[in-house]
């Protein structure tokens, strides 16, 4: 790590050196610094003084010093150089553009691959690689490539809270050498990756990117965030990573033609990841929704329809069976099924069984509203957590594909219940969402994607 420095509050050293130590990087770590020691590791004044081979170098030094660093990497036989360093083509200035060109020429001439510049680099849990101390150490099945470093923080943290883990995450910044096209091709053949996600602001080779997207989408699901869609966004993309953003309608058509799935932002990407990972593909759009609260049930009907799901009415035979164990006072035996029985464990199992046996719905969705529950702490612990754990286990016995909606809570004792419910879902591998609209939208798009993926081959090749 070239440019590492001491001190307990040096942010860059914490990001790029301490993260490797914390995640258990399996190789040797060498800080390059004017100090004798950094983070408990012996430091070296320059790359050439390090004994033995060096495979990968992370640059934290100013842009003006990177050409000499690249030359040292060539002499040392370094395989890859990742530059957190900014101040290159993304500035839009001739000096920065030329500096990036020279850097690429030196690296390519000496067989060194460049990641960046202006990027966070690589998070690979299986190898102990990270640039953030709180990223999960467990490896998963999702890969993410991103021109934006901050988007990798957003996605990894938000997805981790929903039970998603990653195989590889690459923030590639300006993409001066290794870029989105090469990364897509690599990940499409990566046995450790089942789903590919990408944040793209623009590209220097649209036709090649379209072909790479198409190749990847034939191998596994590909989910894309494309930003820089407005005139202001286009200018922002250029100044951020030097990307050529292009016309949004062209991008929309290209992503669809490639067979990839475009989403609006990180929140929707996480919802889609949860759906792909934890929800078996339903056979259709019909859902039976279990919930509590009359207003919440009415809202649920609107949100399901807006998201592309269908709520079939409960037929008389099913209603008659529900009446055998559901107290009519405080209940609504339509769909959504708003039942007071949700508060009584002895009625919950036959309720779930009845809806699971009902042949019309293709899936079950349980809507939980911690924000409207009793607020005394002892009730929170006894009912909202302990009883809900038993209810969750019963719900998971249903044969139909199932999802859970856990409404967000902003304050009060319900916060404890919220996190406990999320933890239950993570432990049981259940797809869960913060709102019914987001659940319906994700499941609806999942069904669309599943149908289109089966219907026709993607092009071009």
Question: What residue spans do the PLM features occupy?
Answer:
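Catalytic-core regions of core metabolic enzymes
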Residues: 1-461
């Amino acid at each position: 790590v070239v440019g590492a420095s001491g001190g307990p509050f040096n942010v860059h050293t914490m990001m790029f050196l301490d993260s490797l130590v914390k995640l258990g990087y399996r190789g040797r770590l060498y800080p390059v610094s004017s100090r004798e020691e950094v983070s408990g590791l012996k430091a070296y004044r320059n790359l050439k003084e390090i004994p033995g081979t060096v495979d990968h170098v992370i640059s934290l030094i100013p842009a003006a010093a990177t050409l000499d660093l690249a030359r040292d990497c060539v002499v040392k036989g370094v395989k890859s150089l990742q530059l957190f360093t900014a101040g290159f083509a993304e500035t839009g200035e001739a000096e920065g553009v030329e500096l990036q060109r020279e850097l690429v020429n030196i690296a390519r001439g000496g067989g060194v691959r460049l990641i960046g510049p202006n990027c966070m680099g690589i998070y690979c849990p299986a190898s102990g690689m990270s640039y953030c101390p709180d990223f999960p150490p467990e490896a998963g099945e999702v890969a993410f490539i991103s021109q934006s470093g901050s988007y990798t923080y957003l996605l990894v943290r938000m997805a981790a809270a929903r039970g998603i883990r990653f195989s590889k995450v690459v923030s590639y910044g300006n993409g001066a050498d290794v870029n989105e096209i090469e990364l897509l091709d690599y990940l499409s053949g990566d046995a450790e990756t089942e789903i590919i996600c990408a944040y793209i602001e623009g590209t220097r080779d649209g036709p090649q990117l379209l072909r790479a997207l198409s190749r990847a989408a034939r191998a596994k699901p590909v989910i894309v965030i494309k930003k820089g869609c407005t005139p202001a966004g286009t200018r922002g993309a250029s100044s951020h990573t030097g990307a050529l953003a292009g016309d949004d309608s062209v991008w929309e058509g290209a992503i669809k033609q490639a067979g990839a799935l475009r989403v609006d932002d990180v929140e929707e990407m996480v919802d889609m990841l949860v759906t792909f990972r934890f929800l078996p593909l339903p056979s259709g759009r019909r859902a039976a929704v279990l919930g509590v609260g009359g207003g919440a049930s009415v809202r649920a009907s609107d949100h399901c329809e807006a998201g592309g799901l269908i709520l079939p009415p409960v037929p008389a035979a099913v209603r008659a069976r529900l009446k055998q164990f559901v107290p009519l006072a405080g209940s609504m035996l339509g769909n959504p099924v708003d039942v007071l029985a949700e508060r009584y464990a002895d009625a919950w199992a036959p309720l779930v069984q009845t809806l699971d046996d009902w042949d019309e719905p293709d899936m079950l969705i349980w809507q939980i509203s911690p924000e409207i529950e009793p607020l005394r702490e002892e009730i929170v612990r006894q009912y909202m957590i302990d009883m809900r754990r038993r209810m969750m286990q019963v719900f998971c016995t249903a044969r139909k594909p199932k999802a859970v909606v856990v409404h967000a809570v902003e304050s009060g004792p319900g916060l404890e219940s919220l996190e406990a419910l999320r933890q239950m879902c993570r432990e049981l591998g259940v797809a869960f969402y913060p709102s019914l609209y987001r659940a319906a939208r994700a499941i609806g798009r999942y069904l669309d994607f599943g149908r289109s993926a089966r219907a026709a081959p993607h092009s071009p090749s």
